[in-house]
Amino acid sequence: MEWPREVFSKSLFPSLSHYSSATIPVLPESGPSWTILDKTSPNSLQQQIDKLVSSHPNSQDHKSFSSTITFDQCNGPVIIEHGAIIEPSTHFIGPCYIAKEAVIRHGAYVREYSWICSKAVVGHASEVKHSILLPGAKAPHFNYVGDSILGTAVNLGAGVKLSNLRNDGAEVILRIGDDRRPSGLRKF
C-alpha cells in the first residue's frame, strides 16, 4: 500500500534528528511511524526494548529508590537510567525503559513495553502502556497513554486518554484526507 509521506517518521517527528539515537527508539523509515507498535513487525518497539534491556549496564539499582516505589519484573527488567527522577508511590511493570532526565511523578503507573525518553514526563496518576514518549513529551496528570507514540515536546492536557481499541476485534481505520485506510493494528 502506498502511504503519503506525512505518515512517515521524518515528517511527523522532524526534530528527532537533534537527539542521540541511543536515547530514542529507532522509528520506521520506510513505512508509517505506527508500525513500530506492531509486535510482529521487524524492529518493533517490543523487540527494541527486549534488546535494550538484555544488554543495558546503566540502570539504577532499584534499592536506591523510596520503598513506596514498586517493581514487577516477572516478564522483564525495569531499566531506569541514572539521572531519571522517580517520585514516590510509582509502579513499574517490566520490561520498560526510563531514560536519563525523564520524570516519573507521584502515583504514576508505567507498564510493559513503554519507552520514556529523556526529559519526558509521566505525571501524577498517569498510566503508560506499550507506548513511546519522545524527548520532552508530557503526560502531566491524570492521563492514559496506551499503544501510542507521543511526539517530541507534546504536552497533553489534564485527563487526556490516548486509546483506540476496536471492540469488534477489527483493525483501527485511519482517515487521511478523504481516504480511509487500515492501520494494521487493533489497538492504536
List PLM regions with ranges.
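Terminal amphipathic alpha-helical/low-complexity segments used for targeting or macromolecular assembly
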Residues: M1-I69
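Structural signal for interior beta-strand "rungs" in well-ordered beta-sheet cores
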Residues: K63-F188
